């Protein structure tokens, strides 16, 4: 099953081959502008950045790839280990001739962004990250909020194929849960959810959570992250998030030279809810790091 790529006025679309992945890339703004690499999360795709893509801030070239196996990108040649995905996206930067970028990430795109930041800090001028835990966690910080993971992640990791392809789970539960003011609009939720009826996309999402629960969380508990970030990080966080507690992005536990945390009256899907604020913070980061 397939779905049409949702239209966004004025964008350029291409397919770029990198590290065995056929990336679907959507971009806008001047081709010689300062590059901004924007990474989406689950259960979404590049369309979450439609506001920035339709009206890129002056001087910025906004580049929003679909992550491996998501959206309209080809499948990942692995089981979605986040370090593998980080390497895939770094290879995409190489293929597109992007030496340094401003990085933007939300949800799993935020997680992958942190892996990239720590692996190759010289390639990033700054990082705007939204509603994702920073990587400097310990069992003490995670355990009080582990129940949040158990509320949905085991289901996606185990029966995610059927759940995403054959039920309204994404629209009604993931996008429709919580206070009405913070829910994704039904029409927008449908644009995201329809793509996850494709078996490649549903499998990629299932692998995302299965690998996280079975491999990456146990590994992180045994070997906590010790690398320090030298890249300026600006964490924007919707405080009504059910999936990720804001304490997991606390500046007090961030091992970073320059890290700020901004609470926002929004839910998990802060880009959909507050595109104006995301745009403003990107412009501020670009000016700050020029």
Regions found by a protein language model. Name each.
Residues 2-14, 21-23, 28-30, 35, ...:
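Flexible "cap/lid" subdomain of the alpha/beta-hydrolase fold that forms the substrate-access gate
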Residues 41-44, 107:
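Active-site glycine-rich loops that stabilize anionic/oxyanionic intermediates
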Residues 17-19, 40:
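Short strand-coil-strand connectors
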Residues 266-279:
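Catalytic histidine-centered segment of alpha/beta-hydrolase-like enzymes
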Residues 43, 50, 279:
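Conserved catalytic core of two-component sensor histidine kinases
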Residues 47-61:
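Short amphipathic alpha-helix adjacent to the substrate-entry channel of hydrolases
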